[in-house]
């Protein structure tokens, strides 16, 4: 994986608390190109879903998520393996891929702790939603299975604006 590097601490106040979203930018670009989705929206989804934490694990119960962590890779692997065995509904990794997809495609959830694999799946899921709903923001709203489609879309939109502000401050966006 090509890495663009971590940005200087002098701009830490504007950065999301976890900088993995930037370190994995090359994976986001590759996935966005492969599935014809917008790089910026994919990065905003990552910021909303995990703040860029590749080891994020969220257990879903009664329509609400229970975020576990922060976790080391070893801890995340153990937790994901246990959740998989018990048949729990959970989300894994940087873009919080849901266990429903893992069961459907018969993929060991530990693979989704790799940020680039996880991001590829995020782009795949988003592309499926865009194809199904024929409208980007409706697709974004349905990305995480939320019943509050408009609320989730707005959350992603606000993250998109936040990331655009960071890019502008760095001279990456004019």
What are these regions (language model features)?
Residues 14-174:
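Catalytic glycan-binding domains that act on GlcNAc-containing polysaccharides
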Residues 7-8:
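N-terminal signal peptide c-region/cleavage motif recognized by signal peptidases
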Residues 1-4:
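Sec-dependent N-terminal signal peptides
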